Amino acid sequence: TDTKESDFLAEGGGVR
């Protein structure tokens, strides 16, 4: 989770 994009992708693919 480096950036916002990487964060949501790592968290749950942006479905969070």
Swiss-Prot record:
GO cellular component, one term: extracellular region
Compartments in which it is found: Secreted
Top-rank taxon, per record: Eukaryota
GO term, biological process aspect, one: adaptive immune response
Keywords per UniProt: Adaptive immunity, Blood coagulation, Coiled coil, Disulfide bond, Hemostasis, Immunity, Innate immunity, Secreted
PTM notes: Conversion of fibrinogen to fibrin is triggered by thrombin, which cleaves fibrinopeptides A and B from alpha and beta chains, and thus exposes the N-terminal polymerization sites responsible for the formation of the soft clot. The soft clot is converted into the hard clot by factor XIIIA which catalyzes the epsilon-(gamma-glutamyl)lysine cross-linking between gamma chains (stronger) and between alpha chains (weaker) of different monomers. Forms F13A-mediated cross-links between a glutamine and the epsilon-amino group of a lysine residue, forming fibronectin-fibrinogen heteropolymers.
Main location: secreted
Quaternary structure and partners: Heterohexamer; disulfide linked. Contains 2 sets of 3 non-identical chains (alpha, beta and gamma). The 2 heterotrimers are in head to head conformation with the N-termini in a small central domain.
Known role: Cleaved by the protease thrombin to yield monomers which, together with fibrinogen beta (FGB) and fibrinogen gamma (FGG), polymerize to form an insoluble fibrin matrix. Fibrin has a major function in hemostasis as one of the primary components of blood clots. In addition, functions during the early stages of wound repair to stabilize the lesion and guide cell migration during re-epithelialization. Was originally thought to be essential for platelet aggregation, based on in vitro studies using anticoagulated blood.
Domain notes: A long coiled coil structure formed by 3 polypeptide chains connects the central nodule to the C-terminal domains (distal nodules). The long C-terminal ends of the alpha chains fold back, contributing a fourth strand to the coiled coil structure.
Record protein name field: Fibrinogen alpha chain
Lineage of producing organism: Eukaryota, Metazoa, Chordata, Craniata, Vertebrata
UniProt gene name: FGA
